């Protein structure tokens, strides 16, 4: 969802890419970078980078570029990555288990703190350091741990019901792997990851190549 007093959604989506590239630069021992050099790393024009950053203030100096560490700090603050974000994960099938085991979240200030499923055969099983809980307990856990973020990895037919319960419990942002569009209030953000839809969009280009 996008609000009139916010930068365009596409700008927000690029900020994590900028942050990741800046971290790589620091790891390489590079402490100053131009818009052109940063843009080449993520296939974005220098003008676009300057425009994106201008929504949030003045960064860098003409002819000198950006201080990598300072710019990274500013972007992390803009994204709220200077604080801890607890996340609940609902749906612990093969995909959910892979997400639960992914180690890249914690280094970015994001931590999966609870796993939920409605399958009695899965409840009580351990995935990494966490035990799968009954989805019936999700309201209590969301309240206790002050969770605002959730990941949904359930079948499409269950996704809306799961989202409704999470939102009623206090969740305000959902990352959904379910192949359906969720109906949510205006003050709730939803992002979708649908590998099938992405692959189908890519087959369009492959099919066009075959026609020529």
UniProtKB/Swiss-Prot annotation:
Binding-site list for NAD(+) = 91-96
The cross-references to InterPro entries, in alphabetical order and at most eight, read: CoA-bd (IPR003781), NAD(P)-bd_dom_sf (IPR036291), Rex_DNA-bd_C_dom (IPR009718), Tscrpt_rep_Rex (IPR022876), WH-like_DNA-bd_sf (IPR036388), WH_DNA-bd_sf (IPR036390)
- GO BP field: negative regulation of DNA-templated transcription; response to redox state
Q: Which GO terms describe its cellular component?
A: cytoplasm
Q: Which GO terms describe its molecular function?
A: DNA binding; DNA-binding transcription factor activity
Where in the cell? Cytoplasm
What does the record give as the DNA-binding region? 17-56
Q: Where is the signal peptide?
A: none
Report the family membership: Belongs to the transcriptional regulatory Rex family.
Function noted in UniProt: Modulates transcription in response to changes in cellular NADH/NAD(+) redox state.
The name this protein carries in UniProt is Redox-sensing transcriptional repressor Rex
